[in-house]
UniProtKB/Swiss-Prot annotation:
It is found in: Cytoplasm. This is Signal recognition particle protein. GO terms for cellular component: signal recognition particle. Belongs to the GTP-binding SRP family. SRP54 subfamily. The lineage of its organism: Bacteria, Bacillati, Mycoplasmatota, Mollicutes, Mycoplasmataceae. InterPro entries: AAA+_ATPase (IPR003593), P-loop_NTPase (IPR027417), Signal_recog_part_SRP54_M_sf (IPR036891), Signal_recog_particl_SRP54_hlx (IPR013822), Signal_recog_particle_SRP54_M (IPR004125), SRP (IPR004780), SRP54 (IPR022941), SRP54_GTPase_dom (IPR000897).
Length: 447
């Protein structure tokens, strides 16, 4: 459970418990803020940032910051949400990459995820911004660092410029010349890290800054490092004048609340967050969207963006047409599940929806079933997926069960879920064609 889940559930529970069937008054405000403060501190939010949030919420709640007709519960959520946005940085801070080639200098301590983040950023800029990106390996000290970058670049089809153990400053200068000659839009410098900040590291980074004049200097910090990331950020910023911060591993631990404090304490924007190991698990940071998640409002904007980026519109339209014609089969289901999987895990997608009634265990069980169903369908021939009626043959059924390594019970569950879902879709289609409004809450495929 990531820090967002931990903090979100604690704050929502506190507000709901103290504000249910009530109006805002000094007593329930005091009790709610006491519990929210404890939630913030337990999530490792810096004490000064926590005080700022609590004091501002208290002033607004007691100072008549009330919308007519809204419940105490709605009011408190609105006020806390606004203060979270303010603490997180108010607005999204996009990269300054209009110059060609633009230089992005990645800095940070060893273990922060700097090298993998450099590759993720290259992938993001290429896919989303249509930029031609050159990765430059400059970490000549950590064994295998440059080789790691080369391998990562191969996975994302990103070219890597490296000169082995050559002086990093010289390599960076040569990389810039190469980028200009070969029409690259962005150059990402993967600099050396250290176990701790030292003068040797800072001198090398300062030389790189002077020679390459980067448009952006991004500090990569480990979101699981606690309050230490504030000190690290300040040390790097004092020496290099950072343009922003990238926080990694936000999905890894409940005590990641120091992230909430970075912008407030350092006045630097969080530009990106890493929420997984995949090379597509880096996202631009939007304070409002993070606050939405923390307050249980979901994150529809990010969900929509992921859908646009990963789902083939023509394929969806084709599937919808087949559904309305009653021709939907297991091949269609398999294809749609594969497209949804590109958007991320079911757990992450569900958290982007403004719903609170689905428990963590229910989501995990649904995720498990989807994985099992996909394995079973992968073990079928195209003919079997296109015409599920042939699966009634015992020999086919046994072959699929054996080939997939799943059980007969799981096979039957897939077929029953599919048949039930298909029947419900047909009923909905008939109602639409006859001009009646279907009850969509009863339709669809149940997992």
């Amino acid at each position: 459970m990531g820090f967002g889940d931990f903090l979100s559930k604690r704050m929502q529970k506190s507000i709901e418990k103290n504000m249910k069937n009530s109006t805002l008054n000094e007593e329930n405000i005091k009790e709610t803020l006491k519990e929210i403060r404890l939630s913030l501190l337990e999530a490792d939010v810096n004490i000064e940032a926590a005080k700022e949030i609590i004091n501002n919420v208290k002033q607004k709640a007691l100072g008549g910051y009330i919308s007519e007709g809204a419940s105490a519960h709605q009011q408190m959520i609105k006020i806390v949400h606004e203060e979270l946005v303010n603490i997180l940085g108010k607005e999204n801070a996009p990269l300054d990459i209009n110059k060609k080639p633009s230089v992005v200098m990645m800095v940070g301590l060893q273990g922060s995820g700097k090298t993998t983040t450099a590759n993720k950023l290259a992938y993001l800029l290429n896919k989303k911004n249509k930029k031609k990106v050159l990765l430059v390996g400059l970490d000549i000290y950590r064994p295998g660092a440059i080789e790691q970058l080369v391998q990562l670049g191969q996975k994302t089809n990103t070219q890597v410029f490296e000169k082995g153990k050559q002086d990093p400053v010289k390599t960076a200068e040569q990389a810039l010349e190469y980028a200009k000659e070969n029409n690259f839009d962005v150059v990402i410098l993967d600099t050396a890290g250290r176990l701790q900040v030292d003068q040797v590291l800072m001198k090398e980074l300062d030389n790189l800054k002077k020679k390459t004049s980067p448009n952006e200097i991004l500090l990569v910090v480990d979101g699981m490092s606690g309050q230490e990331i504030i000190n690290v950020t300040n040390e790097f910023n004092d020496k290099l004048k950072l343009s922003g911060v990238v926080v990694t591993k936000l999905d890894g631990d409940a005590r990641g609340g120091a992230t909430l404090s970075i912008s407030y304490l350092t006045k630097l924007p969080i530009k990106f967050i890493g929420e997984g190991e995949g090379y597509n698990a880096l996202a631009a940071f939007y304070p409002k969207r993070m606050a939405d998640r923390l307050m249980g409002m979901g994150d529809i904007e990010t969900l929509f963006e992921r859908a646009v980026e990963n789902i083939d519109e023509r394929s969806i339209q084709k599937t919808m047409n087949r559904m309305f014609l009653g021709q939907f089969d297991l091949e269609d289901l398999r294809n749609q599940l594969a497209q949804i999987a590109k958007m991320g895990s079911l757990n992450k997608l569900m958290k982007m929806l403004p719903i609170n009634k689905v428990s963590e265990s229910q989501i995990q069980e649904a995720q498990r079933k989807l994985a099992v169903f996909s394995i079973l369908m992968d073990s079928m021939t195209l003919k079997e997926r296109r015409d599920p009626r042939v699966l009634k043959a015992i020999s086919r059924k046994n072959r699929i069960i054996k080939g997939s390594g799943r059980s007969e019970k799981e096979f039957n569950e897939l077929i029953n879920s599919f048949e039930k879902g298909k029947k419900q879709v047909l009923e909905i289609t008939k109602m639409i064609k006859s001009g009646r409004m279907p009850n969509l809450s009863k339709g669809g495929f149940k997992f």
